[in-house]
Amino acid sequence: MALAAELIRAPSVTPHADDALELVAKRLEAAGYRVERLTFETGGVPIPNLYARIGTDGPNLCFAGHVDVVPEGDATQWHHAPFAGTVEDGVLHGRGAVDMKGAVAAFLAAALAFGRPQRGSLSFLITGDEEGPALDGTVKVVEWLKARGETIDHCVLGEPTNPDALGDAFKVGRRGSLSGILTVKGVQGHVAYPHLADNPIPRLLKLIGDLTAAPLDHGSDFFPPSNLEVVSVDVGNPVFNLIPAQATARFNVRFNDLFSLESLKSEIIRRLDGAGLTYDLAFQTGASQSFLTAPGPFTDLVASAVEEVTGRRPEPSTSGGTSDARFIKDICPVVEFGLVGRTMHKVDEATPVKDIEALTAIYGRIIARYFSTFA
């Protein structure tokens, strides 16, 4: 808990996470870890990351996380200063307590208590670019690991996975995400002379209707149904007497393992083409594929460790938004387990100290069981 409070007292609003990351690096170096400080600058701002490892042989169990946080908002609305790391009545208060400095501190404490594995390796992948664009964070560290032939066999990501109580759920996969911009062009004109104009809005509404009329699917064994949401419809017209020249809709799809990115794009185009209308469609960069860490010894190990400490067997889940697991899954199986997420990103973010202590115990059991199972 003391380390979690210290991390909170190192303000690290994305992308300025250097001080918080250095706290982690120094503790790992003191414990004998080989620490690589990695800075990437694709987006124009230097982003700090670290990869640290103790041991040289496999298997390599990695903890992944981030120390950057979202802004605190209006600090006067907080009952405790957002970067003071205050503990009151058994609760740790501050930005990042839940998401996710508490989990970083818990795994660090568990790993240092475990020491150097007799066989195999322990490692950390910690970024300062998860809450921001995520261009120079975990995705770049994964590329760096691939380039140098560094192998990670399994990974635990410390995102807050529990909706209400520690032990509710752990993430075994994530839905994919695809965004698009749909545009219909017309001819601008005066509303009193519609025959001299061409209103694109009715055609856009027809396309939206065809796009959303039927479910994309009905879900799979591990995922809920894929979901397409239209998030904006824009014509850029603030007046009442002008027919607009074009109309645009933006949409996002969260999709399951029944689709690949390409098959989903094909289905969207098929539905739009069925309307028999002319349109422009631009899929946005940054799309991600769904993934699943299949049930097996690793997921059982994590679930059992949670159950031993909390008394409840966590439900495997694929709900929620995206996380850095979408990058890590390219190099190894990954599961996510952390604190209770009710206050993440909110004013008065906080977590009970007992939850951090229990999470430390869970991570300790995961580490011990991992090397007795896989090493």
Curated annotation (Swiss-Prot):
The active site is at D68, E130. Zn(2+) 1 binds at H66, D99, E159. It catalyses: N-succinyl-(2S,6S)-2,6-diaminopimelate + H2O = (2S,6S)-2,6-diaminopimelate + succinate. One of its GO terms (molecular function) is zinc ion binding. Pathway: Amino-acid biosynthesis; L-lysine biosynthesis via DAP pathway; LL-2,6-diaminopimelate from (S)-tetrahydrodipicolinate (succinylase route): step 3/3. GO terms for biological process: diaminopimelate biosynthetic process; L-arginine biosynthetic process; lysine biosynthetic process via diaminopimelate. Gene3D superfamilies: Zn peptidases. It is an enzyme of class 3 (hydrolase). Binds 2 Zn(2+) or Co(2+) ions per subunit. Zn(2+) 2 binds at D99, E131, H345. Keywords: Amino-acid biosynthesis, Cobalt, Diaminopimelate biosynthesis, Hydrolase, Lysine biosynthesis, Metal-binding, Zinc. Its EC number is 3.5.1.18. InterPro entries: ArgE/DapE_CS, Bact_exopeptidase_dim_dom, DapE_proteobac, Peptidase_M20, Peptidase_M20_dimer, Peptidase_M20A. Its cofactor is Zn(2+); Co(2+). Catalyzes the hydrolysis of N-succinyl-L,L-diaminopimelic acid (SDAP), forming succinate and LL-2,6-diaminopimelate (DAP), an intermediate involved in the bacterial biosynthesis of lysine and meso-diaminopimelic acid, an essential component of bacterial cell walls. Belongs to the peptidase M20A family. DapE subfamily. Homodimer. PANTHER family: ACETYLORNITHINE DEACETYLASE (PTHR43808), N-ACETYL-L-CITRULLINE DEACETYLASE (PTHR43808:SF31). NCBIfam families: dapE_proteo (TIGR01246), PRK13009.1 (NF009557). This is Succinyl-diaminopimelate desuccinylase. It comes from Xanthobacter autotrophicus (strain ATCC BAA-1158 / Py2).
